[in-house]
């Protein structure tokens, strides 16, 4: 988010009137939904190793794999239905982001939530990722090309809060969430952790991006952006290296 704000939107993303007010928001699609889907499923597969590292026994590993499967699956289906109803057709690109949003959302509580909690996480993640992308794009006019803020920031916060709300004492971690015990202690701890991470990350990334901007530069030139970084950075005739002449 800090980087997107400091770097500014891509050329042609926002069309402004003479008064400088945004009058049109242009969609700049990616190169290939097919390759995007492949990358999404590679990440999903790898997430079992990522979350599975929290296990300390076979039974806890099974529980973690269950929650890690349910949340992204439910998030994907939720976004499919939500965008279908809202726009008249499902948004495949947004559904791929929803899969990742569900994975991000369940990471904090992969060993603390049960199947029911995973479903709740997935439903909220599927709606949240769409809402955040649209707010950034249409309301705040912050250009986030891959929807990283909606996937990682928003759902990282949601997933961390979900532990305080939905943690089941019978799950492997044995934590007590507000829904099951009525106690708000865990929710308070999670909220404090979120606040600390947000402040630290915002401050550190602002400094890092300022240093980059004042030294090697944070953004490529307009000419390089128009030609495309596949050409200017990598010397490729297009984004698809397989189609380049030998």
Language-model regions, residue ranges each:
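Glycine- and aromatic-enriched membrane alpha-helices
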Residues: 1-246
């Amino acid at each position: 988010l800090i980087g997107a704000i400091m770097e500014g939107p891509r050329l042609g993303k926002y069309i402004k009137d003479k008064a400088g007010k945004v009058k049109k928001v242009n969609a700049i699609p990616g190169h290939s939904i097919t390759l995007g889907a492949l990358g999404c499923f590679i990440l999903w597969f790898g997430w079992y190793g990522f979350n599975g590292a929290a296990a300390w026994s076979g039974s806890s590993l099974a529980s973690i794999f269950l929650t890690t499967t349910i949340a992204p699956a439910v998030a994907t289906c939720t976004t499919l239905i939500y965008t279908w109803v809202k726009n008249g057709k499902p948004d495949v690109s947004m559904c791929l982001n929803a899969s990742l949003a569900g994975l991000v959302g369940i990471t904090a509580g992969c060993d603390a939530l049960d199947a029911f909690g995973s479903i709740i996480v997935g439903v909220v993640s599927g709606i949240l990722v769409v809402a955040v992308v649209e707010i950034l794009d249409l309301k705040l006019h912050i250009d986030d090309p891959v929807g990283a803020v909606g996937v990682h920031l928003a759902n990282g916060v949601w997933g961390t809060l979900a532990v305080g709300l939905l943690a089941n004492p019978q799950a492997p971690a044995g934590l007590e969430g507000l829904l099951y015990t009525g106690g708000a202690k865990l929710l308070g701890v999670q909220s404090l952790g979120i606040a600390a991470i947000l402040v630290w990350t915002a401050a550190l990334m602002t400094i890092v991006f300022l240093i980059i901007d004042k030294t090697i530069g944070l953004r490529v030139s307009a000419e390089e952006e128009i030609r495309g970084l596949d050409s200017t950075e990598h010397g490729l005739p297009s984004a698809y290296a397989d189609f380049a002449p030998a």
